[in-house]
């Protein structure tokens, strides 16, 4: 088995090694365990930097497990004239389709051309032609009405004149983050979850900080060496609090990078910087595939406001999204769908799939993510740009904005910005493949070809070890999902699982795939957790209660 992610698994949280780990001399301290932070960790580690990533909650806890699950160029950006962003995204999509096969997969989209509705056939065909040109291949096709209805049999037929099909891609966003983190670990990167930044440390404040918090030799109290040394007020590290043990630590680094996404303004405020982000919420519905059966994705324009909405098959269920509204709730709390957003998305479904007569009780789960969007003052949230930004302020490099698809580009841009602050480091910063292709799995009669490809994509070089570690019956799928029991055991054993929600919402996606968050399979989940994590009956009961309370408050349909 490959070395596991730092931070855990054992009944005590596996945190005993943290003081020695944090006392090392680090080149980069990366704050934030989503796709942006993971990407920076990977690109830094593979180029020889000593890089440490800390995440205050769980890896992919924020936006990176609550995205729309699409790896796409963004057709709508063409309408806004953002050709550079679309071209960059399309190229990264093509890289990921090749390099992360089984995790990033092609997804065909169908878009109906309805009489009198925008954008209209000619405009949409023009956009798709540009899209294909950027990808270097033709993936668009126009179909007359009858043929389009055969491809998408449940869509509304009134006023339908035909339709277009085009290709994008989809992924399991949380598993993409974990795959990147595992790859970074292979190159010497270190990632720790449930380790929150309480305060940024600044050069010149070391003595005061050490006196106030009782830092001891060997616990990160060393003076910083490098570009920031001697510049009073410059960020040079962080005071951390362990979310599992409540212990406090200090860590120093030559450069501190904030990759905290929609939460970036919080760290920036410690240095007196004014807010620059506009958190926007994107909410989604999850329905059973049998109630909304789709052979391919369906893209549509919402009848109320003309915004794009999609429905597509994902992990054995059907996803519907997304909204785009200002998120004004407390950023310290998890985002959740609102009653108005449920109504908005259901209205889109009723308009596009009238004969299915979908109702709210069909919904298995909901989820909401908060996008880190740079505030430009647009009255319409959907008009805000989706480009990434880098700000260097008193030694803190903030990397925010951008899209899931372009995480590699964002990471390389961050390292280019960091390079002048890391004297003596002159690595080549040209793009490299995100992943090296893992060897094929040995034949196993309990796994189909598609299941084997899925495991290779999600676990890379560790896929064979996962299969070999499976107990009898653990290569079977769970409750109609595409997840197998062996994935639960593997995650509990070696993927820094600290809480039940980590296992069911991010290491696997059972919390989105099964009704009630997976309550019907809890007995078997319990057996795995107690065997691999050493949880007592009391601990299991507390974890189950906390998870189900979280699921009911943030992943179910809100009460009217």
Regions from the language model: what does each represent?
Residues 24-26, 244-255:
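Core beta-strand elements of the Rossmann-like FAD/NAD(P) dinucleotide-binding domain
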Residues 175, 183, 266-269, 274-320, ...:
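C-terminal catalytic lobe of FAD-dependent flavoproteins
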Residues 37:
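N-terminal Rossmann-fold NAD(P) dinucleotide-binding loop
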Residues 1-28, 43-47:
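Extreme N-terminal leader/targeting segments of oxidoreductases
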Residues 45-66:
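Glycine-rich FAD pyrophosphate-binding loop
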Residues 69-151, 461:
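Dinucleotide-binding Rossmann-like beta1-alpha1 core, especially the glycine-rich loop
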Residues 32-34, 56:
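Glycine-rich Rossmann-fold phosphate-binding loop(s) that bind the pyrophosphate
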Residues 113-192, 200-210, 229-234, 315, ...:
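Flavin (FAD/FMN) cofactor-binding and adjacent substrate-gating region
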């Amino acid at each position: 088995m490959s070395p596991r992610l730092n931070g855990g698994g054992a009944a005590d949280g596996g945190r005993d090694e943290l003081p020695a780990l944090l006392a090392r001399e680090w080149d980069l301290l990366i704050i934030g365990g989503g796709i942006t932070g993971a990407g920076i960790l990977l690109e830094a580690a593979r180029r020889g930097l000593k890089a440490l990533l800390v995440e205050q909650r769980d890896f992919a806890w924020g936006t990176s497990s609550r995205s729309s699950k699409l790896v796409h160029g963004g057709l709508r950006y063409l309408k806004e004239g953002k050709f550079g962003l679309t071209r960059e995204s399309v190229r990264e999509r093509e890289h990921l389709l090749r390099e992360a096969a089984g995790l990033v997969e092609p997804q065909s989209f169908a878009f109906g051309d309805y009489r009198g509705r925008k954008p209209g056939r000619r405009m949409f065909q023009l956009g798709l032609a540009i899209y294909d040109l950027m990808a270097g291949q033709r993936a668009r096709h126009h179909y007359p009405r009858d043929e389009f209805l055969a491809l998408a049999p449940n869509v509304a037929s009134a006023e339908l004149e035909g339709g277009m099909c085009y290709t994008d891609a989809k992924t399991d966003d949380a598993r993409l983050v974990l795959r990147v983190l595992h790859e970074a670990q292979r190159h010497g990167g270190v990632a720790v979850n449930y380790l929150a930044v309480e305060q940024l440390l600044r050069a010149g404040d070391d003595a005061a900080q050490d006196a106030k918090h009782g830092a001891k030799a060997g616990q990160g109290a060393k003076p910083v060496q490098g570009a920031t040394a001697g510049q009073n007020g410059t960020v040079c590290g962080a005071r951390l609090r362990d979310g599992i043990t409540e212990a406090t630590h200090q860590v120093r680094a030559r450069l501190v990078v904030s990759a905290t996404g929609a939460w970036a303004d919080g760290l920036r405020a410690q240095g007196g910087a004014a807010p620059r982000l506009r958190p926007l919420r994107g909410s989604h519905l999850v329905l059973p595939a049998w109630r909304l059966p789709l052979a391919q994705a369906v893209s549509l324009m919402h009848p109320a406001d003309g915004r794009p909405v999609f429905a597509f098959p994902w992990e054995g269920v059907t996803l519907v999204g997304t909204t785009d509204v200002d998120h004004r709730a407390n950023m310290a709390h998890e985002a959740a769908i609102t009653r108005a957003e449920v109504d908005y998305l259901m209205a889109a479904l009723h308009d596009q799939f009238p004969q299915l007569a979908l109702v709210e009780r069909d919904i298995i789960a909901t989820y909401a993510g908060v996008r880190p969007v740079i505030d430009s003052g647009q009255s319409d949230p959907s008009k805000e740009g989706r480009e990434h930004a880098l700000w260097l302020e008193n030694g803190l490099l903030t990397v925010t904005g951008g899209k899931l698809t372009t995480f590699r580009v964002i990471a390389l841009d961050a390292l280019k910005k960091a390079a002048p602050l890391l004297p003596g480091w002159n690595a080549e910063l040209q793009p490299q493949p995100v992943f090296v292709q893992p060897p094929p799995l040995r034949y196993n009669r309990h796994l189909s070809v598609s299941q084997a490809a899925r495991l290779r994509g999600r676990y890379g070089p560790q896929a064979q070890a996962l299969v070999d570690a499976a107990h009898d019956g653990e290569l079977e799928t769970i409750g109609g999902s595409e997840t197998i029991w062996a994935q639960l055991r593997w995650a509990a054993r070696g993927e820094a699982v600290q809480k039940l929600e980590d296992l069911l919402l991010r290491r696997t996606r059972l919390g989105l795939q099964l009704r009630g968050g997976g309550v019907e399979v809890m007995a078997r989940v319990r057996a795995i957790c107690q065997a691999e994590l050493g949880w007592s009956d009391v601990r299991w009961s507390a974890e189950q209660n906390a998870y189900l309370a979280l699921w009911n408050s943030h992943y179910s349909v809100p009460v009217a």
